[in-house]
């Protein structure tokens, strides 16, 4: 079981040459653009899962679910675990199938956000939000690794520049989607 899981995250073998074949060249360029758009959109969605707490912070305090101090502790857990995870997950992303690695982190982060909606226990929030920090740390490294694998050193600066705007996309998506959801629920 354990080895099958490792095989799931194993880097795909490189595809043989054929750079002179025009059909393969077109396909290669299409895949590179798909990779760039996937990494940018994916990392933007990571931010939706990271910033959701900021949108609901005020109602949580006003309803007496948590105090500002408790929310500060919860938020600190995410960033402490995120820092440790970014170090280790950066190393792992560099040695794994980055598509699967990034997808796993995003899926787990989304599931944790969903679970947070079913609890009002401070300790459960600390544990889940810290765990969210771990899965969040899988996002940036995966995006950087995928761009590094698909773009030459001369092209990377341009694509990294555009990719780095993905957090702005994620922040906009967060505030718009959460606001729409809350207004829909509140009527």
Whereabouts are the PLM-identified features?
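Short hydrophobic/alpha-helical segments at membrane-entry points of transmembrane helices
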Residues: 121-129
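Cytosolic juxtamembrane N-terminal segment immediately preceding the first transmembrane helix
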Residues: 2-48
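Glycine-rich segments within core transmembrane alpha-helices of 12-TM secondary carriers
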Residues: 161-178, 182
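Extracytoplasmic
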Residues: 34-68
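Cytoplasmic helix-loop-helix junction between adjacent transmembrane helices
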Residues: 128-165
């Amino acid at each position: 079981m354990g080895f099958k899981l490792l095989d799931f995250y194993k880097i795909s073998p490189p595809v043989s040459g054929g750079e002179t074949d025009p059909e393969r060249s077109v396909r290669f360029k299409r895949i590179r653009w798909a990779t760039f758009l996937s990494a940018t959109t994916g990392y933007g969605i990571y931010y939706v899962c990271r910033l959701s707490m900021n949108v609901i912070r005020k109602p949580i305090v006003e309803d007496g679910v948590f105090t500002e101090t408790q929310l500060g502790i919860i938020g600190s857990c995410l960033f402490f675990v995120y820092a440790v995870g970014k170090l280790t997950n950066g190393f792992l992303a560099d040695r794994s199938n980055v598509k699967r690695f990034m997808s796993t982190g995003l899926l787990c982060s989304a599931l944790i956000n969903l679970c947070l909606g079913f609890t009002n226990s401070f300790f459960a929030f600390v544990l889940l939000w810290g765990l969210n920090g771990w899965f969040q740390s899988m996002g940036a490294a995966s995006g950087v690794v995928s761009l590094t694998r698909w773009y030459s050193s001369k092209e990377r600066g341009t694509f990294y520049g555009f990719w780095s705007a993905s957090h702005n996309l994620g922040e906009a998506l967060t505030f718009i989607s959460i606001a729409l959801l809350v207004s829909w629920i509140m009527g």
